[in-house]
Amino acid sequence: MNNYIFIISAPSGAGKSSLLKAFLATDIGKDNYAVAISHTTREPRVGEINSREYYFVTVAEFEQLLSQDGFIEYAKVFKNYYGTSKAELDRLLALGKNIILEIDWQGAQQTRAIYGDRAKSIFILPPSLDELRKRLEKRNTDSKETIDYRMEQVQSEISHADEYDYLLVNDDFSQSLEQLCKYFEQNIQS
């Protein structure tokens, strides 16, 4: 099987994680895909478990892996490091799965530079900035200051959307999930 790497990026609150979770519960998703678990230096949110959502590490641990060229991509986002390790990608490729990377635009650029056409990319957009703010407030995981900071960064993130192979506006969740499933199906058959 020729494995692909699918890069999924979106501003915080656009619905990326919810769409991926729903996709991975579908027949095509659970049988053919695996999400690479990223390393991060941020604190776990309530309910997050180490090695399920992220590998939670200290700044020193992250920087040590970085100095050993242990990441295929990394970035500092919202004052925290995030990165996908080479070991994680090797682990998933050995399972014969297509890999999904939930990463930002900086990581997407780095990954495409390494994997070229083998890396497909999707950018998920919110229907509007007002809706995005409502979603961030509704999930009740960030302070007002953090939400304000995230909203300040949105324009910069969205300015890179044209670098992606496919743009998906997540307005209606069911329709967005259907479009995402079609995109994945078409791209493993091509």
Curated annotation (Swiss-Prot):
What is this enzyme's catalytic activity, as reactions? GMP + ATP = GDP + ADP
Q: Which Pfam families match?
A: Guanylate_kin (PF00625)
- Subcellular location per the Swiss-Prot or TrEMBL entry: Cytoplasm
Residues the record lists as binding ATP? 10-17
Keywords attached to this entry:
ATP-binding, Cytoplasm, Kinase, Nucleotide-binding, Transferase
Q: Which Gene3D superfamilies match?
A: Guanylate Kinase phosphate binding domain, P-loop containing nucleotide triphosphate hydrolases
UniProt-listed Enzyme Commission number(s)? 2.7.4.8
Alphabetical list of CDD domains matching this protein: GMPK
Question: Is-annotated flag, keyword Transferase?
Answer: yes
Q: One MF term in GO for this entry?
A: ATP binding
Task: Fetch the InterPro entries from UniProt.
Answer: GK/Ca_channel_bsu, Guanylate_kin-like_dom, Guanylate_kinase, P-loop_NTPase
Q: Which residues form the Guanylate kinase-like domain?
A: 3-185
Question: Does the keyword Kinase feature in the UniProt annotation?
Answer: yes
Task: Give a GO cellular-component term.
Answer: cytosol
- Entry's PANTHER family? GUANYLATE KINASE (PTHR23117:SF13), GUANYLATE KINASE-RELATED (PTHR23117)
The record's section on HAMAP family has: Guanylate_kinase
Give the family this protein belongs to, as stated in its UniProt record.
Belongs to the guanylate kinase family.
Describe the task this protein carries out.
Essential for recycling GMP and indirectly, cGMP.
Protein name as annotated: Guanylate kinase
Organism expressing this protein natively: Francisella tularensis subsp. holarctica (strain LVS)
Task: Please state the gene responsible for encoding this protein.
Answer: gmk
